[in-house]
A protein has these predicted regions:
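Hydrophobic anchor at the beta1->P-loop junction of P-loop NTPases
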Residues: 6
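Conserved substrate/cofactor phosphate-moiety recognition/catalytic segment
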Residues: 9, 16-49
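Pre-Walker A adenine-sensing motif
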Residues: 1
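Short, well-structured alpha-helical interface segments that form or flank functional binding sites
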Residues: 12, 16, 57-58
């Protein structure tokens, strides 16, 4: 099943880009009200469900999915990584962006190895 996952820090255009794809879902809407530990689990359960999923928390869901599915494949999954913010960030947003990039660098090689197509945006 084809799925597009759009990842990146705050202000990078994830939501705007997602609106140009079929069935866009915003990660924050899916995890609202869930405890921190449950958020990654819930997002991991969305991997492979088709459509488009975007949000800053998606990298955590991908990391959790990789850990939970050690032999799982991601053919048909496109991951778009956006790293350049288009707006000035607050100090908190800058810290969040740094954390997201750290997780991204950790998981990107494994995503490729498992068959995901990765597209780097700006």
């Amino acid at each position: 099943m084809k799925q597009t996952l759009i990842v990146g820090g705050p202000g990078t255009g994830k939501t705007t880009l997602a609106k140009t794809h079929p069935d866009p879902r915003h990660a924050d809407d899916l995890i609202h009200g869930k405890a921190w530990s449950e958020q990654s689990d819930h997002l991991a359960s969305q991997i492979g469900q088709g459509g488009t999923l975007e949000g800053a928390a998606v990298v955590r869901g991908l990391r959790k999915w990789l850990a939970q599915n050690p032999t799982g494949r991601l053919e048909g999954t496109e991951v778009i990584h956006l790293s350049q913010p288009y707006i000035p960030l607050s100090a908190g947003q800058e810290r969040m962006a740094k954390g997201i990039e750290t997780v991204w660098k950790e998981i990107a090689p494994e995503l490729r190895r498992r068959g995901a197509t990765i597209r780097e945006g700006s």
